[in-house]
Amino acid sequence: MADDPSAADRNVEIWKIKKLIKSLEAARGNGTSMISLIIPPKDQISRVAKMLADEFGTASNIKSRVNRLSVLGAITSVQQRLKLYNKVPPNGLVVYCGTIVTEEGKEKKVNIDFEPFKPINTSLYLCDNKFHTEALTALLSDDSKFGFIVIDGSGALFGTLQGNTREVLHKFTVDLPKKHGRGGQSALRFARLRMEKRHNYVRKVAETAVQLFISGDKVNVAGLVLAGSADFKTELSQSDMFDQRLQSKVLKLVDISYGGENGFNQAIELSTEVLSNVKFIQEKKLIGRYFDEISQDTGKYCFGVEDTLKALEMGAVEILIVYENLDTMRYVLRCNGSEEEKTLYLTPEQEKDKSHFIDKETGQEHELIESMPLLEWFANSYKKFGATLEIVTDKSQEGSQFVKGFGGIGGILRYRVDFQGMDYQGVDDEFFDLDDY
């Protein structure tokens, strides 16, 4: 989906925030003991600490003893969390503390603090019976940056669009000779001069595009739109002078009636649909590439939990592709009376069979060390295996086929791996039934 690892990492961060928002929104507490605190990047920890001390004094006057104690406890937890930071991190700080009531009716303390993946320019302090996640949701609004090149016979404009913010990066005018009807021996010379000037103009546009849209050898925009009223945009897109890295990012060629800034505005209007579908298109392209590996039988692919984990351990996975709602769980169990641990990967159907959690020889239940959704474990661990993680949906035809046909988990490999010829030592086949995935 993303050509460069930084974009893929960002998508994983977005997935983590979505998951966190979901769990925070579902949480409810008794009274007003759930604190939501957001500190913007340039704020001071000392100011927030003083504000919390004042709040502690105010909360001491709450009449209800139970509510008073839980609010004071939550404020103390926030104060403890803030002590971990000397200053506000570059992207700001988000803290959620409080006592929530679980589905079983039990009370559970929640203490979460993290630096968001991009700056959060909101200041918030609220005590309520729920956590406030509106500012986090705003972070998720897709803010991919798109580049625009508006080119016609009178000049070129280079701009970007990010969210609702458009910016003109550079523009220049050009004086190209017009076609004319002078006859005689000069006609060919004029035509040659005209073509030469036109060629130089396209070259200048191509070179400027590299300066503006490529930084550190990587394209710095999610996609490019070429707009213009004449055939310059087509000429540019097909030209050998136009950098290959930029060429691969062209999303659309747009016909517009004006040049300059008016043309820029018109180009934005005419390309809104394609821009909103970029993630969808990237996903289709990624899964299409995965299917190509399979149809060409390159051996550079894996699917199913078992093979994918083996390939990860070998360091063979270049891109790990996982369905966003993969329901496989990862369990780490300790065999009773020993230090030996074993890891199981079970679907909801397999979880119902309790024999997975019982020692066959002694009949005793294994000690549960850790349990979490496999996708969450991947999101925390994928970098250790040298892979990039792409989390996909089943909204496209390709995505749906990936989920139904391949169990929603697979990978594109760096080199060919013969899974059938591999010896799966130490893996109990009982826990891996590929028919279940």
From Swiss-Prot:
Primary gene name: etf1
Chief location of this protein within or outside the cell: cytoplasm
Keywords tagged on the record: Cytoplasm, Nonsense-mediated mRNA decay, Protein biosynthesis
Protein name, entry field: Eukaryotic peptide chain release factor subunit 1
Gene3D superfamilies membership: 3.30.1330.30, eRF1 domain 1, eRF1 domain 2
UniProt lineage: Eukaryota, Metazoa, Chordata, Craniata, Vertebrata
Assigned GO CC terms: cytoplasm; cytosol; translation release factor complex
Subunit and interaction comment: Component of the eRF1-eRF3-GTP ternary complex, composed of ETF1/ERF1 and eRF3 (GSPT1/ERF3A or GSPT2/ERF3B) and GTP.
Family: Belongs to the eukaryotic release factor 1 family.
